[in-house]
């Protein structure tokens, strides 16, 4: 048996007839399967035991030899070898075909490989193979040409005329003769000569032919092997036949297809023996050809063969294809043992790294561990009695279970797993009941709620798996979101509300201005009702024990509230005292304005002071980031647990409720609406007089109503009491926002009709007042569209993620530094005047390519090759530097991956990326996961020139698939000045540079962006709209396209409020640009017109340049992610993605080697993935658990000094 962890590559090729015979254990001669009476396999049939091995372990067909002691004996009566039954999964048979048959993949695929080799059209091939025409194989000395097609009539005429001086024949036999006659070397040389002169279609055809012929020449495959003499029969266990309850049999479709082949083959043999007339033999040969076609790929040609109920039969190709095929169903994703699933409920008292596991579930999952422990403790005599104990659930089992579970993490997963935080490890705590308890803070990462969601539990079995789960996957380790490096475990809903309530301030509350000797005294006063949580009080700075206060401040008083004292108790000791929600308070220290001398009259002072706003959701997130930066993981997770407990406690104490009386309707609403109605009437008058067009009228009406709604919204927010429960909910960020509130108390505003156009009649009522019937009806459009969109969006977004993962799965951090000599210059990304992504965001966590100096003082801000953290980036931005050159994935030279320096910081851990990190997968997940939050719609902005801007998910797909965008803009190919803009029947823009002048015709309906006298640079847009990236590539080269795609993707996500790290998009775009189309091969021997990886292209050129020969020339191509995935070097990865048969056909002809560099290939063949701890360098490491060591020590009789795992 092959050892999966020990082979270097996997190769695929065409099988020669002899190879097929060498695989086989015997010929299948009969179409029978099993005997209907004895249910034993028929001899020489499709399930024959002599060929494929015994059905029962160590037992021959006739029963002469039973038991393992006869291992390896071949029975003299029935000829069956005595061995294990599982050999029936690996032994193959064969069928000797009475006539050669063409393989449908090579004849029918697009392009037809047989057609390319023979230089015949697929149409004529089909006529020959299916016995409609003769083909001349040897013209002899007749005027006929080789490969000329003759109809039956013509053949007769020529035969009568020339007799046997020429040969022409039909069927796959003729094709095989033609294939065998080909001299590959001669053909290749002829084609290379032709390429030097050929143009257009002829050139394209020649390149395609050359590619196939070269493939045959280099791979050692014979072209004639595309025609089969022998057909392999796959092992019977892979096409099983099973008995159902009613005595009927269910069988794999392959058996039916094989039976048809065998029947027709046997009939053909008989006809040939009888010397039947030619026409009958030909018909039988055609039927045999069709039967083999159906077996290999049913439905590829003609009508598919159907089984009972007109269902097409599943052929060998269908076994591989699609979601249910071998690749995606069994090789890339398998069902696993030691798992369970149940409904989740909230576990507010769990620690960050814990989850509640139902007792009975835990017992079932950890059964083998419990049984082993029962035996080793002497509570059961053997495994069998231990098993019985566990199944009867005897009392001592629970104690053992507690022990087994104590240090054993489990994995919790919620589907859909959109990013790596969808599976995390927890320490299980046994709970009563049947629901899994989940920590409330990890819900965001899982996108889980408790309305009936279910989660699956998996048990890591080996010591290695447990160590990885504990060190890498524990929930407390995954505080940052890999997509942007911000905390993903921010408190939500009740927790936010509780902390908001806790840190509120009230003027003139009970006991305002009291001074207490320390926080304990203040708390006692609060518990006894002397002060309120919101009362502004003072405490001595010295009593707080905070090292961030200066020595001279220690005898002053700090103005704060009781709630804030409580809130600060959960923070680490050396963290600044947080008194106001500002960045400087977090990063530096408490602002001095809250410190007053100890003899101050606090009560009087407070009367003049404004109230400090409470801490909202965003600020809590900043606190977590800051704590993480200063104190790392353990401290942060402890602080998070304390923040959660505080939030729950005080949102309960606050007793915030919502009633109808909390929704106050605005008194000035009527006036605002009347005013708007008057404006609309004025517009209508202008329209009726013909002063404005229909479009302008519509636009103005819409803008009047949206302005009215905005006005109502701002007035509402102004009149609200800060203690209004609904306002508190939306202001704190717990639930809802200003626009929800406007709909409740103000007006609902404008709605869109089903086609997405805004109806100009607004909904004037609010929910508090109630909608009229018409208003309600109009509202339903939007609601229904929302639900339909969500359903479609989920599928689209999931498919996008799958394509992204596929294209980037082999991008792994392979080395420390690739030593590239190029960097990427970054500036803030802007859209008009609005900044989409600031320079700060683009610098944090990246390595500087050049030393950056302060523009005024010339002081070094960051050295070349240094990683920029938050502080450095802030200094650079504050110094007024506008552009910085950084190391980027775009310019990385590492083969099959990236290097540490070009990637920079790993956003998920906040520290340097490690060698072996699968950054491609992380990038794909980070871009795909927020996909569900993007909108589906194409915005139709009204206006005179209505242009459709594609946004949201469709725009992202358009960018990553490198499609021609909707509403394409015209771009200039040269730098220069706009010298002329012609408007009229033919709109034109003329750009002039020093060397040339170019005219660009502007399509009707496009809006111009340039005017005469503007300076333009190559690749700049002349009209509004999106650029076609393929055009841009021709004009600006790779740099321009990379920059454009990065900017556009960021724009879509940022406008939806989703932040994604640049480096993720860079990884994807780099994968789209990794190929070059060879224009002229020079002396490199690369085929012209082929797609080659940039690195391979450069290496080939380096070699020929060193020998003073001619290098190849090529131009970079931009591939969409689907195309890029299929163009990958690994055929296993491509075949398991899409177009399985095409990829495998191609790979077999080329005799491709898969070097197993990516993740998918290794998952498919069952090796460890070459990333993370699966890297070769970790293979030699062994893992000792304390448990094994204790056992060894006891055996050796040494004193028990045990190394415990960290």
Curated annotation (Swiss-Prot):
Binding site for Zn(2+) 2: 818, 892, 899, 902
Cofactor: Mg(2+); Zn(2+)
Its EC number(s): 2.7.7.6
Keyword Nucleotidyltransferase recorded: yes
GO cellular component terms, semicolon-separated: DNA-directed RNA polymerase complex
Cofactor note: Binds 1 Mg(2+) ion per subunit. Binds 2 Zn(2+) ions per subunit.
Spans through the membrane: none
Binding site for Mg(2+): 449, 451, 453
GO biological process, one term: DNA-templated transcription
Pfam families xref list: RNA_pol_Rpb1_1, RNA_pol_Rpb1_2, RNA_pol_Rpb1_3, RNA_pol_Rpb1_4, RNA_pol_Rpb1_5
Binding site for Zn(2+) 1: 60, 62, 75, 78
UniProt-listed InterPro entries: DNA-dir_RpoC_beta_prime, DNA-dir_RpoC_beta_prime_bact, RNA_pol_asu, RNA_pol_N, RNA_pol_Rpb1_1, RNA_pol_Rpb1_3, RNA_pol_Rpb1_3_sf, RNA_pol_Rpb1_4
Enzyme class: transferase
GO MF, one annotated term: DNA binding
Reaction catalysed by this enzyme: RNA(n) + a ribonucleoside 5'-triphosphate = RNA(n+1) + diphosphate
Keyword line: DNA-directed RNA polymerase, Magnesium, Metal-binding, Nucleotidyltransferase, Transcription, Transferase, Zinc
NCBIfam families: rpoC_TIGR (TIGR02386)
Family, per entry: Belongs to the RNA polymerase beta' chain family.
Role noted for this protein: DNA-dependent RNA polymerase catalyzes the transcription of DNA into RNA using the four ribonucleoside triphosphates as substrates.
Assembly information from the UniProt record: The RNAP catalytic core consists of 2 alpha, 1 beta, 1 beta' and 1 omega subunit. When a sigma factor is associated with the core the holoenzyme is formed, which can initiate transcription.
Protein name: DNA-directed RNA polymerase subunit beta'
Organism the protein comes from: Shouchella clausii (strain KSM-K16) (Alkalihalobacillus clausii)
């Amino acid at each position: 048996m092959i050892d999966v962890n020990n082979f270097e590559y996997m190769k695929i090729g065409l099988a020669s007839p002899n190879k097929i015979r060498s695989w086989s254990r015997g010929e299948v001669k009969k179409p029978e399967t099993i005997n209907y009476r004895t249910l034993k396999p028929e001899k020489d049939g499709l399930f024959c035991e002599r060929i494929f091995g015994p059905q029962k372990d160590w037992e021959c067909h006739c029963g002469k030899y039973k038991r393992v002691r006869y291992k390896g004996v071949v029975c003299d009566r029935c000829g069956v070898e005595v061995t294990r039954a599982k050999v029936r999964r690996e032994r193959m048979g064969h069928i000797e075909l009475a006539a050669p048959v063409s393989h449908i993949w090579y004849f029918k695929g697009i392009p037809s490989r047989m057609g390319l080799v023979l230089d015949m059209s697929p149409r004529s091939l089909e006529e020959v193979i299916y016995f409609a025409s003769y083909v001349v194989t040897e013209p002899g000395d007749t005027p006929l040409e080789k490969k000329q097609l003759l109809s039956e009539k013509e053949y007769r005429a020529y035969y009568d005329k020339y007799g046997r001086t020429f040969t022409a024949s039909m069927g796959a036999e003729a094709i095989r003769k033609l294939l065998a006659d080909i001299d590959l070397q001669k053909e290749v040389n002829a084609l290379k000569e032709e390429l030097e002169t050929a143009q257009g279609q002829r050139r394209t055809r020649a390149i395609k032919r050359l590619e196939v012929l070269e493939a045959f020449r280099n791979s050692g495959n014979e072209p004639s092997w595309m025609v089969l003499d022998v057909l392999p029969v796959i092992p019977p266990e892979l096409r099983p036949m099973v008995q159902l309850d009613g005595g009927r049999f269910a069988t794999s479709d392959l058996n039916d297809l094989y039976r048809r082949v065998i029947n027709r083959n046997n009939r053909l043999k008989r006809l040939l023996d009888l010397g039947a007339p030619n026409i009958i033999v030909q018909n039988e040969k055609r039927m045999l050809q069709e039967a083999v076609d159906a077996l290999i790929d049913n439905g590829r040609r003609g009508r598919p063969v159907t089984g009972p109920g007109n269902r097409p039969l599943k052929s060998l190709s269908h076994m591989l294809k699609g979601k249910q095929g071998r690749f995606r169903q069994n090789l890339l994703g398998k069902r696993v043992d030691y798992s369970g699933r149940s409904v989740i409920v909230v576990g507010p008292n769990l620690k960050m790294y814990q989850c509640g596991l139902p007792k009975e579930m835990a017992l079932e999952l950890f059964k083998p561990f419990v049984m082993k422990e029962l035996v080793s403790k002497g509570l059961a005599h053997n495994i069998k009695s231990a098993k019985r104990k566990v199944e009867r659930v005897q009392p001592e089992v629970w104690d053992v279970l507690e022990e087994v579970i104590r240090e054993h993490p489990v994995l919790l997963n919620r589907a859909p797993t959109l990013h790596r935080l969808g599976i995390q490890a927890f320490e299980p705590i046994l709970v009563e009941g049947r629901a899994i308890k989940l920590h409330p803070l990890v819900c965001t990462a899982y996108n889980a709620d408790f309305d009936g969601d279910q989660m699956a539990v998996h048990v890591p079995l080996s010591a290695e798996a447990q160590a990885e789960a504990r060190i890498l996957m524990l929930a407390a380790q995954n505080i940052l979101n890999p997509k942007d490096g911000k905390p993903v475990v921010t408190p939500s809903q009740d927790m936010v509300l509780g902390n908001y309530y806790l840190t509120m301030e009230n003027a003139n509350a009970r006991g305002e201005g009291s001074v207490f000797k320390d926080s304990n005294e203040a708390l006692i006063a609060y518990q006894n009702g002397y002060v309120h949580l919101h009362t502004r009080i003072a405490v001595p700075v010295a009593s707080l024990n905070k090292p961030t206060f200066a020595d001279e401040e220690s005898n002053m008083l700090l103005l704060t509230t009781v709630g804030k004292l409580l809130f600060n108790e959960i923070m680490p000791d050396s963290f600044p005292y947080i008194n106001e929600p500002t960045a400087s308070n977090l990063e530096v220290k408490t602002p001095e304005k809250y410190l007053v001398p100890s003899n101050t009259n606090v009560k009087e002072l407070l009367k003049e002071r404004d109230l400090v706003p409470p801490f909202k959701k965003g600020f809590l997130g900043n606190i977590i980031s800051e704590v993480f930066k200063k104190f790392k993981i353990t401290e942060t997770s402890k602080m998070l647990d304390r923040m959660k407990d505080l939030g729950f406690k005080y949102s309960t104490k606050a007793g915030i409720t919502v009633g109808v009386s909390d929704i106050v309707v605005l008194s000035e609403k009527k006036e605002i609406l009347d005013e708007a109605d008057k404006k609309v009437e004025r517009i209508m008058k202008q329209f009726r007089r013909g002063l404005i067009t229909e479009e302008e009228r519509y636009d103005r009406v819409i803008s009047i109503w949206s302005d009215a709604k905005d006005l109502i919204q701002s007035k509402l927010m102004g009149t609200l009491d800060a203690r209004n429960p609904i306002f508190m909910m939306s202001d704190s960020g717990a639930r809802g926002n200003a626009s929800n509130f406007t709909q409740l108390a103000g007006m609902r505003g404008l709605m869109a009709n089903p086609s997405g156009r805004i109806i100009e009649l607004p909904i004037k009522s609010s929910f508090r007042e109630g909608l009229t019937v018409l208003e309600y009806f109009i509202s339903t459009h939007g609601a229904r569209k929302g639900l339909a969109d969500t359903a479609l969006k989920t599928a689209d977004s999931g498919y996008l993620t799958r394509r992204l993962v596929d294209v980037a799965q082999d991008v792994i951090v392979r080395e420390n530094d690739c030593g590239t000599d190029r960097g990427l210059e970054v500036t803030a990304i802007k859209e008009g005047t609005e900044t989409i992504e600031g320079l700060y965001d683009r610098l944090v966590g990246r390595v500087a390519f050049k030393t950056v100096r302060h523009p005024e003082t010339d002081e070094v801000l960051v050295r070349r090759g240094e990683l920029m953290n938050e502080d450095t980036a802030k200094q650079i931005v504050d110094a007024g530097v506008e552009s910085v050159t950084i190391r980027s994935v775009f310019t990385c030279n590492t083969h099959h991956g990236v290097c540490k320096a070009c990637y920079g910081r790993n956003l998920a851990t906040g520290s340097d990326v490690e060698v072996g990190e699968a950054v491609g997968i992380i990038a794909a997940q980070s871009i795909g996961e927020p996909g569900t939050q993007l909108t589906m719609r194409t915005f139709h902005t009204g206006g005179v020139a209505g242009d459709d801007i594609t946004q949201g998910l469709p725009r992202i797909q358009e960018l990553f698939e490198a499609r021609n965008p909707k509403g394409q803009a015209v771009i200039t190919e040269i730098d220069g000045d706009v010298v002329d803009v012609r408007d009229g029947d033919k709109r034109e823009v003329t750009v002039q540079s020093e060397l040339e002048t170019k005219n660009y015709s502007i399509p009707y309906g496009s809006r111009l962006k340039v005017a005469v006298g503007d300076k333009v640079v190559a690749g700049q847009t002349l009209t509004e709209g999106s650029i076609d990236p393929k055009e841009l590539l021709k004009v600006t080269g790779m740099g321009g396209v990379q920059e454009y795609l990065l900017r556009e993707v960021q724009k879509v996500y940022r406008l939806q409020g989703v932040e994604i790290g640049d480096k993720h998009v860079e990884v994807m775009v780099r994968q789209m640009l990794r190929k070059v189309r060879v224009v002229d091969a020079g002396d490199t021997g690369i085929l012209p017109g082929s797609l080659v990886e940039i690195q391979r292209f450069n290496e080939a050129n380096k070699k020929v340049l060193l020998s003073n020969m001619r290098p190849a020339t090529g131009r970079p191509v931009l591939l969409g992610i689907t195309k890029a995935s299929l163009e990958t070097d690994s055929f296993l990865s491509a075949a398991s993605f899409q177009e399985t048969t095409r990829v495998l056909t191609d790979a077999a002809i080329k005799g491709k080697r898969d070097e197993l560099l990516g993740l998918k290939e290794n998952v498919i063949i069952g090796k460890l993935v070459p990333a993370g701890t699966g890297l070769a360098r970790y293979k030699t490491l062994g893992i000792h658990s304390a448990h094994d060591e204790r056992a060894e020590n006891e055996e050796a009789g040494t004193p028990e000094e045990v190394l415990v795992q960290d």
